Swiss-Prot record:
<keyword id="KW-0677">Repeat</keyword>
<dbReference type="InterPro" id="IPR001623">
    <property type="entry name" value="DnaJ_domain"/>
</dbReference>
<comment type="subunit">
    <text>Homodimer.</text>
</comment>
<feature type="repeat" description="CXXCXGXG motif">
    <location>
        <begin position="167"/>
        <end position="174"/>
    </location>
</feature>
<dbReference type="GO" id="GO:0006260">
    <property type="term" value="P:DNA replication"/>
</dbReference>
<dbReference type="GO" id="GO:0042026">
    <property type="term" value="P:protein refolding"/>
</dbReference>
<feature type="binding site">
    <location>
        <position position="203"/>
    </location>
    <ligand>
        <name>Zn(2+) 1</name>
    </ligand>
</feature>
<feature type="binding site">
    <location>
        <position position="150"/>
    </location>
    <ligand>
        <name>Zn(2+) 1</name>
    </ligand>
</feature>
<feature type="repeat" description="CXXCXGXG motif">
    <location>
        <begin position="189"/>
        <end position="196"/>
    </location>
</feature>
<dbReference type="InterPro" id="IPR008971">
    <property type="entry name" value="HSP40/DnaJ_pept-bd"/>
</dbReference>
<feature type="repeat" description="CXXCXGXG motif">
    <location>
        <begin position="150"/>
        <end position="157"/>
    </location>
</feature>
<feature type="binding site">
    <location>
        <position position="167"/>
    </location>
    <ligand>
        <name>Zn(2+) 2</name>
    </ligand>
</feature>
<keyword id="KW-0235">DNA replication</keyword>
<dbReference type="InterPro" id="IPR001305">
    <property type="entry name" value="HSP_DnaJ_Cys-rich_dom"/>
</dbReference>
<dbReference type="GO" id="GO:0005524">
    <property type="term" value="F:ATP binding"/>
</dbReference>
<keyword id="KW-0862">Zinc</keyword>
<feature type="domain" description="J">
    <location>
        <begin position="5"/>
        <end position="70"/>
    </location>
</feature>
């Protein structure tokens, strides 16, 4: 145990905040980490001392005991069983452990905690599908690069398939305890990395991890009626676990591409359909495409205006895990003719002249609008 003042070791004042202590420790740890100072015994010793200091000062109870009793608070009993790896913190691990400690809080927990079970990591795969695929469902083929159990050692990590043996440091528990004064600290065993077992003769193909990189081809069943952003879980299809531990899961995230004709709102579909001016005025029947590839007939009543909506029941999207379907809504867009011939213009003028006395009846919306404008001007004049 270092006899130097722990606050001096980290370069902070005695009243420093926990954040200041953490920042100072990270700076010192980066500077003196053995990976950055190979073969430098002084740097290695300094690294151990600042780990020892940080292990005490980062803990509220231990810091209070140190402030009251100094080093004497931790001289009873000394370190317990387990050995190796310093006094918590980054331990004797590689340089990447520092970044695990620094950024672990953003990943749902501290450092290398997830390695204690050896479970493989979960994977994410983003898949684009069409609206038609979302309606009908499909079976898609995906190729996912991931780790898989090593074929040479069958995932055990041992040469010629040799099985791991119980770790003598933690006796198979994956955790070791250290007694420091009044406190007992439990941490991941640095010898077996929390696995509880070690490989005496590692497999050359996988280096003892029991895993190799591999691209696997999977069939993904996409049910009819899925929504944009739907997540599909494939259990056990993620990264392989360490030395035979359970594999992680694969999550397929679906993104439905925008359609050229249809707009979706839940189980319903909307479609803007251009209606010829004559059909809108006289009425008639039109054919419209549907999401299932068929055509449906829609009756257009006389006097249809832009914005009028017509409903086709059960012509919308499939409903997830149900035989039902949503509805399709046709939104009329009355199309004004362009590029008219001389004869067409003559006919339209004749039509306009013929209806001169019927405008209030033929065009109620426009007549009502201009009547309101006239009233407005009269009110302004009177005011």
């Amino acid at each position: 145990m270092s006899k130097q003042d722990y606050y001096e070791l980290l370069g902070v004042e005695k009243g420093a905040s926990p954040d200041d202590i953490k920042k100072a420790y990270r700076k010192q740890a980066m500077q003196f980490h053995p990976d950055r100072n190979p073969g430098n015994a002084d740097a290695e010793q300094k690294f151990k001392e600042i780990n020892e200091a940080y292990d005490v000062l980062k803990d509220e109870q231990k810091r209070a005991a140190y402030d009251r009793f100094g080093h004497a608070a931790f001289e009873q009993g000394g370190p317990g069983g387990g050995g190796g790896g310093g006094f918590g913190g980054f331990g004797g691990g590689g340089f990447s452990d520092i970044f695990d400690e620094m950024f672990g809080e953003f990943m749902g927990g501290g450092g290398r905690r997830g390695q204690s079970t050896g479970r493989g990591a979960d994977l994410r795969y983003n898949m684009d599908i069409s609206l038609e695929d979302a309606f009908a469902g499909k079976t898609a083929t995906v190729k996912v690069p991931s780790s898989a159990p090593c074929e040479d050692c069958k995932g055990t990590g041992g040469k010629d398939g040799a099985q791991p043996v119980t770790c003598s440091a933690c006796h198979g528990h994956g955790k070791v305890r250290q007694q420091q004064g009044f406190f007992t600290i439990e941490r991941t065993c640095p010898t077996c990395q929390g696995m509880g077992k070690i490989i005496k003769d590692p497999c050359r193909s996988c280096g003892g991890s029991g895993r190799t990189r591999k691209e696997k081809t999977l069939q993904v069943n996409i049910p009819a009626g899925v929504e944009d952003g739907t997540r599909i879980r494939l259990a056990g299809e993620g990264e392989a676990g360490m030395r035979g531990a359970p594999a992680g899961d694969l999550y397929i995230f679906l993104s439905i591409a925008a359609h050229r004709i249809f707009q979706r709102d839940g189980a319903n579909i909307f479609c803007r359909v251009p209606i010829p001016m004559t059909t809108a005025a006289l009425g008639g029947t039109i054919e419209v495409p549907t999401i299932d590839g068929s055509k449906a007939k829609v009756t257009i009543p006389e006097g249809t205006q832009t914005g009028n909506q017509f409903r086709l029941r059960s012509k919308g999207m499939s409903v997830l895990r149900s035989p039902a379907r949503g509805d399709m809504f046709i939104q009329a867009v009355v199309e004004t003719p362009v590029n008219l011939t001389k004869r067409q213009k003559e006919l339209l003028n004749e039509f306009n002249e013929a209806g001169e006395g019927e405008k209030a009846k033929n065009s109620p919306e426009s007549q009502g609008f201009f009547a309101k404008v006239k009233e407005l001007w009269e009110d302004l004049k009177e005011g």
